[in-house]
């Protein structure tokens, strides 16, 4: 029977062999690390056929949007860090593509105030203008231009070509996993508010065991997405304008402004497409310089504001000191002093994140209510000297209280702004008092993947809908202008990424209040790591919302300080402290959180941490989903790490 579990089981065996064969051919072709074997397979096909890491990354991204529709796709956006190595007299190139969603032009600083978390996260209000398709198109244009100039090798791949594997999988379907069903079950109540969302997903079983790899064949575990296939085919045929200006744009705006639900608590969004404002048509990606830092002689290249790379660099800077000799006696892997210091660094760096990180383009001009506000202090936040000042607050004998105040990185800018120095602390009006729209989402609400090709080009790409299943709304077409040749476009989930904005009333919310056209702050931290000699060492990143910088921090330290393989580092227990006070929207986040078995910290370690004053609780589920590639410093051999928390380690 077409699409039967038996036929898919055979296909799965072939897929496993294909992925293994690709792994054995790594020295010739490169590698992809992603959260789903189909995405790895299609990305590595590109590499095996002579494609470059950028081309493989876009194919991988498109497939992930089909097989992980709850985590990413054309309804969201993200950040890609690219490295093109030196060739002859041509210097290495490194850049970031920023496709973070933007707020509609009608967004206002008070748009989320007084609302419940569910009103913000579910429905139209937190839907931002998605950037994924423009990102993919622009990345492939850059790749083709570099190939034309002789700077890059590859397949001269177009967006239409890159979308074909995703179209085929959406049309023919794939077998969902037990992980997919578990994630779906946590969001059934949200999805049930929208008949079109329920229709797409609710024919799947409710028992995760029914779709586990070892379960008997079950056709009900097979998911097809014909509307998404039609939409991707239309984009492949007509280009991104059909999404940002044409019938797909009409369908998006109609879905956002008129949510298809009977629930009176669901709010409409502010996205427009009319004579006055056309939010989708105004969207554009940003090509930015990466931010860089060092750790133990290694160089980090990552995505700066509005992404989370600055927080990651600050975390590593804080612990990079002779007081904390990670990897030696007393500071070994998951020992008390090691974990204690890392928790304290998280409190300090996360306080700074909420005070100073936002959309850098909007930070260039002070708002009327804050005329003395300087630009985002990126140099200060990533300065080792500033980290030393923050580090001085850490005591090995006891823990810092939660709700740590931010420091004053302005004084470490070059030159520092006169209004910020020589004061050594920020005034109350400048502190990051921040009623951030923090979801209670405990699972992976994003996806990350890494790619490296045989030419040495590397890509780290994190992309997101924000919460799992984003806004919970599937785009549908119920107006005449969004029908094309008798087919109605849609079939994909929209983000709720505007929940990344702050909604505090304090003047301290200086950089991250909602504004029209603005990108909300993000914690996505796709990262490249280079050895002291300059050779590539890691391509890594993670899903996990606000926990992402802390997760990537732990993985990098586990590899560099403790000699772990990339798979061991990704599979290791995790902990995070986001320096948030207990409140109606952040219950529990003021604690240091760790995971359930088999990823949990030992009870002995938890007891020791509590004796130092740390409040430690165990999450009800795991958090984060990291993917990475390690390059052996001696042989150049590649190894892949995939996260078992979301079905990885295959």
Residues covered by each model-derived region:
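Bacterial N-terminal signal peptides that target proteins for export
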Residues: 1-13
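Bacterial N-terminal signal peptides
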Residues: 10-22
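Noncatalytic scaffold domains of N-terminal-nucleophile
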Residues: 27-41, 45, 53-238, 243-245, ...
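Alpha-helical support elements that line or immediately flank enzyme active sites
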Residues: 46-47, 134-142, 238-245, 250, ...
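Active-site rim segments in enzyme catalytic domains, especially the processed small/beta chain
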Residues: 66-89, 93-95, 262-276, 430, ...
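Internal maturation/activation junctions in enzymes
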Residues: 205, 273, 325-464, 619-620
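Active-site Gly/Thr loop motif
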Residues: 269-296, 391-440, 488-524, 528
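Extended C-terminal subregions enriched in glycine
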Residues: 455, 498, 517-520, 552-553, ...
């Amino acid at each position: 029977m077409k699409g039967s579990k038996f036929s898919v089981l055979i296909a799965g065996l072939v897929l496993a062999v294909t992925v293994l064969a690709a792994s054995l051919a790594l020295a010739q072709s490169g590698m992809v690390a992603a959260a789903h074997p189909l995405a790895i397979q299609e990305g590595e096909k590109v590499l095996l056929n002579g494609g470059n890491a950028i081309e493989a990354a876009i194919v991988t991204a498109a497939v992930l949007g089909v097989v992980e529709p709850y985590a990413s796709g054309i309804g969201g956006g993200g950040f890609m860090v690219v490295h093109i190595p030196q060739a002859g007299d041509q210097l290495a190139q490194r850049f970031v593509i920023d496709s973070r969603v933007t707020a509609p032009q009608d967004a206002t600083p008070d748009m989320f105030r007084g609302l419940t978390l569910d009103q913000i996260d579910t429905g139209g209000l937190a839907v931002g203008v998605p950037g994924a398709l423009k990102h993919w198109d622009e990345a492939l244009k850059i790749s083709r231009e570099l190939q034309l100039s002789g700077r890059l090798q590859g397949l001269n791949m177009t967006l239409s070509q890159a979308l074909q594997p995703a179209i085929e999988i959406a049309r023919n379907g794939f077998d969902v996993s037990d992980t997919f069903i578990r994630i779906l079950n946590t969001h059934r109540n949200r999805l049930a508010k929208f008949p079109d969302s329920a229709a797409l997903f609710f024919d799947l079983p409710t028992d995760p065991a029914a779709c586990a790899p070892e379960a008997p064949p079950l056709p009900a575990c097979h998911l097809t997405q014909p509307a998404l296939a039609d939409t991707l085919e239309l984009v492949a045929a007509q280009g991104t304008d059909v999404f940002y200006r044409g019938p797909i744009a009409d369908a998006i705006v109609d879905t956002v402004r008129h949510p298809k639900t009977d629930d009176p608590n669901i709010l409409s969004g502010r996205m427009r497409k009319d004579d006055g404002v056309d939010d989708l048509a105004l969207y554009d990606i940003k090509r930015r310089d990466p931010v860089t830092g060092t750790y133990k002689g290694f160089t980090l290249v990552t995505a700066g504001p509005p992404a989370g790379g600055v927080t990651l660099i600050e975390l590593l800077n804080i612990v990079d000191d002779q007081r904390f000799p990670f990897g030696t006696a007393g500071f070994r892997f998951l020992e008390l002093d090691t974990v204690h210091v890392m928790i304290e660094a998280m409190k300090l760096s996360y306080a700074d994140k909420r005070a100073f990180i936002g959309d850098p383009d909007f930070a260039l001009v002070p708002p009327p209510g804050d005329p003395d506000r300087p630009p985002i202090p990126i140099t200060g936040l990533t300065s080792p000297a500033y980290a030393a000042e923050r580090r001085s607050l850490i005591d090995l004998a006891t823990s810092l209280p939660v709700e740590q105040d931010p420091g004053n990185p302005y004084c470490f800018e070059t030159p520092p702004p006169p209004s910020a120095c020589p004061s050594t602390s920020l005034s109350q009006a400048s502190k990051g008092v921040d009623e951030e729209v923090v979801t209670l989402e405990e699972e992976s609400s994003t996806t990350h993947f890494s790619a490296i090709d045989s030419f040495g080009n590397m890509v780290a790409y994190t992309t997101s809908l924000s919460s799992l299943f984003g806004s919970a709304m599937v785009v549908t077409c119920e107006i005449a202008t969004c029908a094309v040749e008798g087919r109605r476009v849609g079939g994909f989930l929209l983000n709720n990424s505007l929940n990344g904005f702050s909604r505090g009333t304090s003047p301290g919310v200086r950089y991250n209040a909602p504004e029209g056209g603005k990108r909300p702050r993000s914690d996505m931290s796709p990262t490249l790591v280079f050895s002291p000699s300059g050779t590539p060492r890691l391509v890594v990143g993670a899903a996990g919302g606000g926990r992402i910088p802390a997760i990537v921090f732990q993985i990098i330290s586990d590899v560099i300080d403790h000699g772990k393989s990339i798979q061991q580092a990704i599979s290791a227990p995790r902990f995070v402290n986001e320096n948030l006070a207990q409140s109606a929207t952040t219950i529990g986040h003021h604690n240091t959180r760790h995971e359930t078995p088999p990823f949990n910290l030992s009870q002995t370690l938890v007891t020791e941490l509590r004796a130092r004053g740390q409040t430690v609780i165990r999450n009800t589920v795991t958090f984060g989903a990291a993917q990475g590639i390690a390059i052996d410093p001696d042989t150049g051999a590649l190894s892949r790490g995939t996260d078992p928390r979301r079905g990885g380690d295959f």
